[in-house]
């Protein structure tokens, strides 16, 4: 019986504390992506390119490209192009990217092109913040949207002014890396948490020996590693696969003010409170009345007199009790019982936090 109770307690503890790998909670400082950007031309469009009269930079770019190919356009030539579009090309250089490796690129129209569907990106250099060329992009663009127009009517599905080229860029220059230099590496938590940082350090010390890891702050854990690239790779592979029990997160409610969506995690709780909500609507209706004389030759004038009607209505407003809720399901039931719309719910949650009834951080994005 004692063994059964011990096994049951151990099962409950492991269920409450969810174990995750260190690699899912942290990243290695210095091992990151680097943004690249470039400006280029897309050709081969089916009459959906830039209107060159409104986007002179497209014509200027085309003239510069033709001159580099040995073709001279006479001065003053007015090229009415419909199959060319000026675009911006963006992508990130992955960590440890090697010369000759291919990466995907995103192509976005910067002029007034109607669609990039069916277009081909001409060779475009991709530069970093240091103005050095790190990759060259070129290829056919895949656009996820579709559209058609005829007789003044048009239909469009998804976005047509942006697309993607799979393996569309080739890395030409490698970024220098400091990996393997020195005897320490820093692991950075995805979310700052003092207890989690200390727990990861303790886990590494239990396996690798005391003093192998030190929590510097709520986000950084410094780890002592052997020198040399290959030794550090093996050391990090072992550390990143270690299991750590994840402690409960901070209670948080995230509100998107643009879309009206409300998201909360499982740690959110409510205290008992009373909520009154109501809607106030004001309707203004203005009409123009025409007054004409009764007789055609009576000397009167035809006048227009405006007539305005204002209607103010207020609905709801009765107090409703919200019970104390200790779990996410109970919180959802309590808020749904109010019958509030998502937009009303945002104001209610803000007021509940001010009143001390919402036990969570409120973040508005």
UniProtKB/Swiss-Prot annotation:
Entry keyword set: Bacterial flagellum, Periplasm, Signal
Single Gene Ontology BP annotation: bacterial-type flagellum-dependent cell motility
Location(s) in or outside the cell: Periplasm; Bacterial flagellum basal body
Signal peptide interval: 1-19
PANTHER family in UniProt: FLAGELLAR P-RING PERIPLASMIC PROTEIN FLGI (PTHR30381), FLAGELLAR P-RING PROTEIN (PTHR30381:SF0)
Subunit composition and interactions: The basal body constitutes a major portion of the flagellar organelle and consists of four rings (L,P,S, and M) mounted on a central rod.
HAMAP family in UniProt: FlgI (MF_00416)
Protein name per Swiss-Prot or TrEMBL: Flagellar P-ring protein
Species the sequence originates in: Shigella sonnei (strain Ss046)
